[in-house]
Amino acid sequence: MKSARHLGLLLLVPVVLLAGCAKQSPGPAASAPPAKHVHHPPHGGTPVVLGEEIYHVELVLDAATGKLSAYILDGEMENFIRLAMPAFDMTAQVNGQSKVLTFHAVANPATGETVGDSSLFETQAEWLKTTRTFDAVIPGLAIRGTTFTGVTFNFPGGNDRD
């Protein structure tokens, strides 16, 4: 009986040793960098972030006509945000000169938007037909009780740093 107990212990020792030497399963993978928070402008334009991504302005250029459209969108660029203001300004630096663009609200009977209750603003300038890149600032834009001032960006690069 003693030899049977010793034999059992002898058989158990290699099993324990083998288990201890077994290949360790890898621990949790090193934490990957967080996924980049990306917004996709619905019209394929330039995203301009307002505040800490509270809202966006999407700028879309029609170079053939020199028309620049500004869509006001929520923080995820999924929903249009209507503004009470009839117009807002943007100052662009073009070849060392300041060029002020005034965006005017666009009424849209299909959506019920009117001047003073619109998410689309447009401007037009001859120089937009030939200029493809510029730095700009929106001096002030009021959205739902919050005023964003001194919003700087590059066109067409935008200012989203995520």
Regions found by a protein language model. Give the residues of each.
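Sec-dependent bacterial lipoprotein signal peptides
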Residues: 1-20
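Intrinsically disordered, low-complexity terminal tails/loops enriched in metal-binding residues
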Residues: 20-162
